[in-house]
Amino acid sequence: MAKSRKISAGMLLFRRTSGKLEIFLAHPGGPFWTRQEEGTWTIPKGVIEDGEDPLDAARREFREETGIEPQPPFLPLGSIRQKAGKTVHAWAWEGDADASTIVSNLMRIEWPRGSGRFQSYPEVDRCAWFAPDLARQKINAAQAELIDRLEALLD
């Protein structure tokens, strides 16, 4: 199926531990992201395939990138537009997961760029739980709004 690179869907997993909110974020895999931290983490997300329901795409992408099956109910967080112009539709769900045991799908990329050599890397190399303020520092800047929206829904 063809994919639109300008529209994605994703899931923001959260939990409440001793009454405190924690946010589950994913760090992109591959050599380009190895040494990058602040502003690079993300909610598990990906492109919506033609004809695919955005919520179904968000659930599929979360499962592919983490090995975890999202469970309802899903809280709609609306859409955000990232710096490069991509729109991301997002939902939140409450659950728990051991971030150290995620299993991500693989992606093939040319590395080094322009070398003609293709290698496989996990799409997500690690996940972690963060307090909301630290999550806002770690996450892609445009996606920080999703944390704000989640907190507003939970208040």
Task: Give the residues covered by each predicted segment.
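Short, charged/polar surface micro-motifs in flexible loops or helix N-caps
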Residues: 18-20, 30-33, 49, 68, ...
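N-terminal strand-loop-strand
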Residues: 2-42, 91
